[in-house]
Amino acid sequence: MRITRILLLGLWLVTSHGLQAQRQRTNAYHLEAGGLVASDQTPFWLRANQYGTVPLNGSIARFSAGLKSDYRAADSTGYRPKIDWGYGLDVVANAGATNQVLVPEAYIKGRLGAFELYAGRRRELVGLVDTLLTTGAYAWSGNALPIPKIQIGVPTFTSIPFTRGIISFLGAYSHGWFENTGRQITGSFLHQKYLYGRLGKTTWPFRLYAGFNHQVIWAGQAAPGVLSPNVAVNGQLPSTLRYYPAVVLGSRGNFQNDNVVTSFEENRIGNHLGSVDLAADADIGSWNVYVYRQFLYDDGSLFYGTNIADGLNGLRLKNRNTPAEGAFSLRQITFEYLFTGSQGGDEFVIDDDRRRGRDNYFNHSQFVDGWVYFSRAIGTPFLTPSNEVRPSLNSGGPIGNNRVSAYHLGVSALLFGTVDVTTRLSYSINAGTYPSPYLTLPTQFSGLLTASVPLNILGGTTLNGSLALDSGGLLPNSVGAYLGLRKSGLFSRPANSQAARSSY
């Protein structure tokens, strides 16, 4: 791909010449080799929220290599350049039942003060949720390969002038490109923006957060016979800049005399989805307590209050103390509850505000591939693509199961002062979709136990192991395991003695 070649050339230039010109810059690398085995389909928590790099089926050998340079930190005098740049490149190769080479990260970024511009693929999670043990933010969870995009924004909470740090914000605005391979609708674009505010200084014992994220898939062309004349004219969806304001604003627009727009699009141009988020955190003794709620939207139901029951609720307890040197030190506990069963009700009447239901999360009448990227759900992995559920279950669209009630527990701990252990335990009740409900309500348990052990070899090496289990009526019953060796370090100074932890 032309974009990939440009990114690789840029990375070569900055790594080969940047080290000579800027001694303060740190270039970090990692190498990992391992193997994954599974008795059937890869268990849920071995593949979910892994940025689309773990295959759905089969045992594999796995290799990855990455190179990254972040913005320079402040020096001993507190000086930090207002203009800076960075880059990231990560390549994953899977061999075995699935043979593939993936590039989950390839980006170049630049900073001017608080503002950042980047182009390429970058691992991201959007929304007010716990980032370590979450099931995933509703709309943008890290479950699929990152979508290539150009983005401008303020990536970290930044104080608004004259508020003395009491009011801060972060946000971004981006344009991206969906893949064409394997999709029935090709040439589609991504529009994404988000804005979050924080009330309270970092030194205060209590802080409040609020904001929203907005994603749109729009534009494209369908092959003959894929879309009916009711939703597209000759398979062509509105794709020019004329429609961009309606995409950004989510407004209906005035397209009555437009021969490209059907009556379907008089509602909205594109498929709009996202969440409105509220959160708070408090320092209580030796713990930081973080509570959050994501209110979901995939139509006008949230505006009219008809799907208010749907959402992601979370509670995180994080130990603020330095881990003890004893046999067991608890670092973090995360509880989450996800409910998506309402969707505004089982009726959709566009002229009746109280019956604008059947939101059919992650499915759409025009974008019939669903809210997926390379067949993986872009948002929460608990809204399950049809190809992941048991074949005996009725499937209604690319996302065969989007009416879910899911309970989740995540725990992070340190054993004997060195062994990093995490566990994820999830239980869900699943109803399929409104158009194609399951005849029963299959339940599902998915569990994961991981351990990372630093080794005194090669300087900065970690042994990573994972065990996972799926048992229930939604996914095929399966047991799986991963074992890998990871080496990480720095180019600009001796390798860090603390090895980076695996994403498993």
Please state what every model-predicted region is:
Residues 22-28, 69-85, 98, 111-115, ...:
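Short loop/turn motifs that connect adjacent beta-strands in outer-membrane beta-barrel proteins
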Residues 79-112, 124-142, 181:
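Surface-exposed loop and membrane-interface regions of Gram-negative outer-membrane beta-barrel proteins
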Residues 33, 48-50, 83-96, 119, ...:
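Transmembrane beta-strand segments that form the barrel wall of outer-membrane beta-barrel proteins
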Residues 208-212, 222-504:
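Exposed, low-structure sequence patches enriched in small/polar residues
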